[in-house]
Curated annotation (Swiss-Prot):
Gene3D superfamilies: Aldolase class I. It holds the Pfam family TMP-TENI. Binds 1 Mg(2+) ion per subunit. GO terms for molecular function: magnesium ion binding; thiamine-phosphate diphosphorylase activity. 2-[(2R,5Z)-2-carboxy-4-methylthiazol-5(2H)-ylidene]ethyl phosphate binds at residues 143-145, 175, 195-196. Keywords: Magnesium, Metal-binding, Thiamine biosynthesis, Transferase. 4-amino-2-methyl-5-(diphosphooxymethyl)pyrimidine binds at residues 44-48, 79, 117, 146. Its cofactor is Mg(2+). It comes from Bacillus cytotoxicus (strain DSM 22905 / CIP 110041 / 391-98 / NVH 391-98). Its EC number is 2.5.1.3. It catalyses: 2-[(2R,5Z)-2-carboxy-4-methylthiazol-5(2H)-ylidene]ethyl phosphate + 4-amino-2-methyl-5-(diphosphooxymethyl)pyrimidine + 2 H(+) = thiamine phosphate + CO2 + diphosphate; 2-(2-carboxy-4-methylthiazol-5-yl)ethyl phosphate + 4-amino-2-methyl-5-(diphosphooxymethyl)pyrimidine + 2 H(+) = thiamine phosphate + CO2 + diphosphate; 4-methyl-5-(2-phosphooxyethyl)-thiazole + 4-amino-2-methyl-5-(diphosphooxymethyl)pyrimidine + H(+) = thiamine phosphate + diphosphate. It comes from the Bacteria. SUPFAM superfamilies: Thiamin phosphate synthase. This is Thiamine-phosphate synthase.
Length: 217
């Protein structure tokens, strides 16, 4: 199997939904199904923070979400945990700068999707040189979902990466809503990653569908 083509990766990033059980008010499996019905293009399992599942419960929950993704042919990515990604035969993994080194991750994951969070041009170049398939850039806007975020980059921060020749697929992260999603694409991102704007929406289906419309218009 060869690594994913750039054009295909770019398409998958369009509406990238990230969720764990503690990101929902409603049943997470219901939220997930609604989001898939609404047209999300990629999913990341991120079971972290207060109230998150651990141990075997976490693994079983991941398997349930993965089964839904397979049903809809939406790739299933695991946040940070390479061992879990391998155990589940996930489609890929997303790592931050504080996680296991990108070189080691690429070696372990083979040709599967590897995404890396980058906050500087140097981090971006290092990730690309060591096998990243896409970069997560952000936070673009202020966010309350993640407690350990870096300084807000803004749309100008996103543009800066493109101006400096970073040409692999990029997904914007942080504080992205239906109202500002199109501006993230215009600033140079291939897609938007979303947690609460879908997971906490009164209708995850309607929200996901609206994001698809904003990103693809």
């Amino acid at each position: 199997m060869a690594r994913i083509e750039t054009e295909k990766m770019s398409q998958l990033l369009q509406v990238y939904f990230i969720m764990g059980s503690n990101n929902c008010h409603k049943g997470p499996l219901q939220v997930m199904k609604e989001a898939l019905d609404g047209g999300i293009t990629l999913f990341q399992f991120r079971e972290k923070g207060e109230g998150a599942l651990t141990g075997e419960k976490r693994v079983q929950f991941a398997k349930q979400l993965q089964a839904l993704c397979r049903e809809y042919r939406v790739p299933f990515i695991v946040n940070d945990d390479v061992d879990l990604a391998l155990k589940l035969d996930a489609d890929g993994v997303h790592v931050g700068q504080d996680d296991e080194g990108i070189e080691v991750v690429r070696e372990k994951m083979g040709d599967k999707i590897v995404g890396v969070s980058a906050h500087t041009i140097e981090e971006a170049h290092f990730a690309i040189a060591n096998g990243a398939d896409y970069l997560g850039i952000g936070p673009i806007f202020p966010t309350n979902t993640k407690k350990d975020t870096k300084a807000v980059q803004g749309l100008n921060g996103l543009r800066y990466f493109r101006e400096k020749g970073i040409n692999i697929p990029i997904v914007g992260i942080g504080g992205i809503t239906i109202e500002n999603a199109s501006s993230v694409i215009e600033a140079g991102a291939d897609g938007v990653s979303v947690i609460s704007a879908i997971s906490l929406a009164s209708s995850a289906f309607d929200s996901a569908k609206a994001f698809v419309h904003q990103v693809k218009k």
